[in-house]
Amino acid sequence: MKNSQRILLTLMLAVASAGAFAQDKLDMFNPVNTSVTSQMIAPDARAAGMGDAGTDPDVNSQYWNPAKYPFCISRAGVSLNYTPWLRQLVSDMDLAYLSGYYRIGDYSAVSASLRYFSLGEVMTNYDSTTGESNGMTINPYEMSFDVAYSLMLSEKFSLAAAVRWIYSDLTYDYTDDTSPGSAFAADIACYYNDYINIGARECQLGIGLNISNIGSKITFGGDDNSEFIPTNMRLGLALMVPIDEFNRFTIAADANKLLVPTYPKQEEGESTEDYQQRVQKEYYDVSSISGIFKSFGDAPGGFKEELQEINWSVGAEYVYNDKFTLRAGYHHESENKGNRKYFTVGAGFRMSAFSLDCGYVIATAKSNPLDQTLRFTLGFDMDGIKDLFRR
């Protein structure tokens, strides 16, 4: 696929900024760009209802932090997640996510997930091989599969590692100069869980760190330049506060930073040729590992712009009798780095064997295509299912 065609499809994946920018703001607009941006979409309704803050252990921890699995109460669990994506723009784009885990003994767990992102049907009217219109319908998609192993090093601390295969097919004619892209990546995560006393209440504190998608760049066929995958560092905290025997609150906060170099901006007076040479040297020739370290100090605006590259989320969850749940949250991204700002709400219902959750996005600007995004999660507790068959 030609660059322009793939860029068009990639823009459909990316989260659009809300509203138009004045020219001076456009000059400052400098988001961190990656390929396979579908890897950054939060898949589950629980965290989505809390502003994308996902520190507390649950069946979908594979995405947020797989080191949390040894602290899950149930022996095993499986979840099915579905998100109709950017329905303000298109009617057939969606994300499906399957996740599951199994605890081995009391101190370790294995887990896996499968992600499938469909861009729906896209009509083409140009055949690059003949130069003629063909009215062809294509179905571009991205997918990934990963497995992880987590281990408790003490009663309060655990580590995890995951490996992931990523595949992106945004092409429509498998000619010599274009083909689907694939990449391999790994996650490294740790999690700390402890009980602390706040007044007369024994509260549960969780702190997690996950560096995800550390891996190779991705190349689409004959393109001269490979592209960065979304390597990301996530630091989160959650505090569960019991009110009484039937009621409890959890508050959570996450901070995220893409560990990918910022695309260089053309300097005033710099020729196009010099700029292209500098982009090649400072961006395309940088390896994925070098790019991780470079990402902490390469923003054109200095330290202030580096801080703008940190997205943050805050959320709260109320649980009644381990059955009914209400959630709310807020997600913030600098207007110079993508301008994703939205509130979220969610609700859930849980029985011994299954749970059902939903999340809903309320964007701060109605022009934001994320507005009114829904997520659904159906979870299964293997211990609860076994208990049903024993009755």
Predicted region positions:
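Sec/Tat signal peptide C-region and signal peptidase I cleavage site
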Residues: 18-22
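Subset of outer-membrane beta-barrel
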Residues: 23-391
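Bacterial N-terminal signal peptides that target proteins for export
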Residues: 1-8
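Bacterial N-terminal signal peptides
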Residues: 9-17
